[in-house]
Amino acid sequence: MATALPPRLQPVRGNETLREHYQYVGKLAGRLKEASEGSTLTTVLFLVICSFIVLENLMVLIAIWKNNKFHNRMYFFIGNLALCDLLAGIAYKVNILMSGKKTFSLSPTVWFLREGSMFVALGASTCSLLAIAIERHLTMIKMRPYDANKRHRVFLLIGMCWLIAFTLGALPILGWNCLHNLPDCSTILPLYSKKYIAFCISIFTAILVTIVILYARIYFLVKSSSRKVANHNNSERSMALLRTVVIVVSVFIACWSPLFILFLIDVACRVQACPILFKAQWFIVLAVLNSAMNPVIYTLASKEMRRAFFRLVCNCLVRGRGARASPIQPALDPSRSKSSSSNNSSHSPKVKEDLPHTAPSSCIMDKNAALQNGIFCN
């Protein structure tokens, strides 16, 4: 049984239910200790990583939205996956800001919302990868190029992804928890039932196995098919997208598998019997880093996405630089302007004769502005 805490570690205020569960699994004392300098730096680093995740996935969404080439089914799924990663970054950032001593100022409902948002992001990401695999498989079987006008299947699959994700994330707050059954409580998530965690891991594992089977079938279809695609460029682009998605799935499995295994250990272990469960934050960080790696994979593996991504970054930089360095034209003296205008009018025919091939005014501009507007002058 858990030992009583010394008076200096007793919380002054907080929720009794949360304290009871955290004390039962052995995590109460650690949450109430003052944060050391090293843990504070780690927290700041995690917050910076989360901000970077949100920023880069937001840029992926903007790049897909602004580029008409990406308005097809495949990139809609990639955009949905970027939205899931963005949500994961926000959810983990909120989780960090509400952790530590602040945990015990939360009600069980707010605690379930805090942790459930992470499960929603995980469920949406996993289901999005499954939806991409299903779409690719159906396309390869029919051997037809993407039809931008037929998007009902895309939105149906994306809608199903979010429905499943929100359902999984809402189950604990709807009653599948261990509020009245302490021996069934998870060590990593003290208010979650071990049965619920085992159920979620089973669902996610089944989805990942299905994804691997679908991509293996797609690979063998491509290798064994004797049918030729009429447009070589479309075929090459399709295979490039396939390679990109396979890399995304592989990285997802590599990043999330350690956390899945840790949850299985949590389900199997007796309370306070497995010290590794108290180091779960590092496994969670590895899983969250997957959301930061996906945009990097898009830009490195897809030439079109790389161009759109870097064009967006360059436009933002040039626009910001132009806003900071906008020149202010000095006012002209009226008398000088009159004399100069009269001189120009008297010599204007000569100038026109001497310079018949003068470049148009649109080309006489700052180089950065020209690049921004897409104007190239000879």
Curated annotation (Swiss-Prot):
Keywords annotated in UniProt: Cell membrane, G-protein coupled receptor, Glycoprotein, Membrane, Phosphoprotein, Receptor, Transducer, Transmembrane, Transmembrane helix
Membrane disposition: Multi-pass membrane protein
UniProt-annotated stretches for the region Disordered: 327-357
Family listed: Belongs to the G-protein coupled receptor 1 family.
Residue stretches spanning the membrane: 41-65, 73-101, 116-134, 154-179, 196-216, 244-265, 282-302
PROSITE patterns xrefs: G_PROTEIN_RECEP_F1_1, G_PROTEIN_RECEP_F1_2
Residues exposed to the Extracellular side: 1-40, 102-115, 180-195, 266-281
Physiological role: Receptor for the lysosphingolipid sphingosine 1-phosphate (S1P). S1P is a bioactive lysophospholipid that elicits diverse physiological effect on most types of cells and tissues. When expressed in rat HTC4 hepatoma cells, is capable of mediating S1P-induced cell proliferation and suppression of apoptosis.
Gene Ontology BP terms: adenylate cyclase-activating G protein-coupled receptor signaling pathway; adenylate cyclase-inhibiting G protein-coupled receptor signaling pathway; anatomical structure morphogenesis; G protein-coupled receptor signaling pathway; inflammatory response; negative regulation of establishment of endothelial barrier; Notch signaling pathway; positive regulation of cell population proliferation
Protein name: Sphingosine 1-phosphate receptor 3
Low complexity compositional bias, start-end: 337-348
GO molecular function, one term: lipid binding
Glycosylation-annotated residues: 15
Entry's localization field: Cell membrane
Tissue specificity of this protein: Expressed in all tissues, but most abundantly in heart, placenta, kidney, and liver.
Positions of post-translational Phosphoserine modification: 326
Designated gene of the protein: S1PR3
Cytoplasmic compartment residues: 66-72, 135-153, 217-243, 303-378
SUPFAM superfamilies xref list: Family A G protein-coupled receptor-like (SSF81321)
GO cellular component, as recorded: cytoplasm; plasma membrane; presynapse
Record Pfam families: 7tm_1 (PF00001)
Stretches of the chain forming a coiled coil according to its record: none
